[in-house]
Design a protein with these regions (language model features):
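Hydrophobic ligand-binding cavity/cleft-lining segments
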Residues: 1-94, 219-232
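Hydrophobic, Leu/Ile/Phe/Ala-enriched alpha-helical segments that form helix-helix packing faces
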Residues: 53-64, 105, 185-197
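Hydrophobic-ligand binding "helix-grip"
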Residues: 92-147, 231
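A short, polar/proline- and glycine-enriched secondary-structure boundary/capping micro-motif
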Residues: 96, 134, 159-168
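Short, solvent-exposed aromatic-acidic interface loops
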Residues: 125-129, 152-161
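An amphipathic alpha-helical core segment
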Residues: 140-142, 147, 152-158, 169-170
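A conserved amphipathic terminal alpha-helix motif
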Residues: 166-212, 217-219
């Protein structure tokens, strides 16, 4: 199916998981943090690192096109946007999958007594996606010292959907490619932000794995809903 038709089909598709579902031993929960070029203390500066990084996130330029490419209807608002993702494995296998932006925010927050400005969005997987779950991307600026960081939070599991060969490929390579995608997002946004600021194209500091709650670490699924990022 042509990408244009596949994108149009996403409009009527539901999510491929129950939003009231609970994580269990087959779900992965990941959270990464990546330091970005900083600013002076205070609210985000016009043309500064925070605003640049926010634009990169909104335009989905954080994704490495060798791993994931995205298409959406130009001019659509961020919240509610349907995105057709092309998942690539070593430039040989390609799978199309749909996601929908279910939330977007640009808000002040307070964490551990510190004030921050936070921009971000969350998308969730649609029917037919080889994975199920949700993922969010955020850009933080700390008001007290001007530090800027990118955060990525994901809760996902295999959906069991798609042709047999895609399910087999996901079982064999999915988790490895998933983590590679996460870390590449962190590296790309750091490099692209620095480049737009005219800074040297040096390798960024490595992303920090803030949270990992894989099978043996995931709490017993009592009554906890599928967790969303709380900004913690």
């Amino acid at each position: 199916m042509r990408p244009e038709r596949a994108l149009a089909r996403l409009q009527g598709l539901p999510l491929n998981f129950d939003e009231g579902a609970v994580p269990h031993h087959r779900w992965h929960v990941d959270q990464l943090s990546q330091a970005l070029p900083g600013e002076l203390p205070g609210e985000p500066a016009r043309g500064g690192a925070w605003r640049i990084a926010c634009r990169l996130v909104e335009d989905y330029r954080i994704a490495d096109p060798a791993i994931v490419r995205a298409t959406w209807e130009p001019g659509t608002p961020l919240e509610g946007r349907n995105m057709l993702l092309e998942l690539r494995l070593y430039r040989v296998l390609r799978v199309h999958a749909g996601v929908r932006v279910t939330r977007a925010w640009d808000e002040p927050r307070r964490q551990d007594g510190r004030r921050a400005r936070v921009f971000g969005f969350e998308y969730a997987t649609l029917d037919g996606h080889i994975e199920m779950g949700r993922m969010d991307y955020e850009v933080w600026k700390w008001i007290d010292d001007g530090a800027v960081e990118f955060r990525l939070h994901a809760v996902s599991g295999a959906s069991g959907q798609g042709p047999p060969w895609t399910r087999l490929g996901f079982r064999l390579f999915g988790r490895r490619e998933q983590l590679r995608f996460y870390f590449r997002c962190c590296e790309r946004i750091a490099r692209l932000t620095a480049r737009e600021l005219g800074l040297p194209d040096d390798p960024p500091s490595p992303a920090v794995r803030v949270r990992k709650a894989d099978p043996t670490q995931t709490p017993e699924p009592a009554a906890n809903p599928l967790p969303r990022s709380s900004g913690a």
